[in-house]
A protein has these predicted regions:
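Compositionally biased, low-complexity segments
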Residues: 18-22
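Extended beta-strand/beta-hairpin segments
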Residues: 23-94, 103-185
Length: 185
């Protein structure tokens, strides 16, 4: 196992798995470490060798949240996905939307606006990319935002979305095209 020293904490890497031995997160933007634990186990003799095993698993996060997860039913044999679980594709789209929303709301606040609600029905498109690999190539955010008090102009909303997109850590980390189709509250 190789080790990377981050401040005074050690993080181990064994193959593709990262093991956190303790956490020190900086607030200055220079470095932060985030973890998730993904758990799956085979349930008896369920046709594993033939690909007929459950894709249901769980994601656990450092704050204590445990989320049921599964492969998308669109990508695995029928009956092997748990449709109630969050699939990685949905989580990817939600993480982009959530990051954008959090920055948008904060920038609106800084501009003296009051956001009452923000609902985004984001959609992602999975298809072959330019290299012929299956990827989420496009995510369209479709936020509906309701403000109290002073109402922003459509230009101001566009500028807030641009600032939010430029600041979003997730958007800065992916090659997926991200579009925003702002909708009237």
């Amino acid at each position: 196992m190789g080790w990377a020293k981050l401040g005074t904490q050690l993080y181990g890497y064994a193959g593709n798995a990262r093991v956190r031995t303790s956490a020190t997160l900086s607030c200055d933007g220079t470095m932060s470490a985030y973890t998730a634990t993904v758990r799956w186990s085979r349930n008896g003799d369920e046709g594993f060798a033939k690909g007929r095993y459950s894709r249901a698993h769980e994601w656990a996060f450092d704050g204590g949240a445990v989320v049921p997860a599964s492969a998308s039913p669109d990508n695995v044999p029928p009956g092997t996905a748990d449709e109630a679980g969050v699939d990685p594709e949905e989580a990817f789209i939600a993480s982009i939307s959530s990051c954008h929303m959090l920055f948008f709301i904060d920038y609106a606040r800084r501009d003296g606006l009051v956001v009452d609600s923000y609902v985004d029905e984001a959609i992602g498109i999975m298809e072959k990319d330019a290299d012929g690999k299956i990827a989420v190539t496009n995510v369209t955010l479709r936020p509906r935002i309701i403000f109290s008090g002073d109402q922003p102009s459509s230009d101001q909303i566009d500028r807030l979305h641009h600032r939010a997109h430029e600041a979003c850590f997730i958007a800065n980390s992916v090659k997926t095209e991200i579009l925003v189709e702002s909708q009237a509250g």
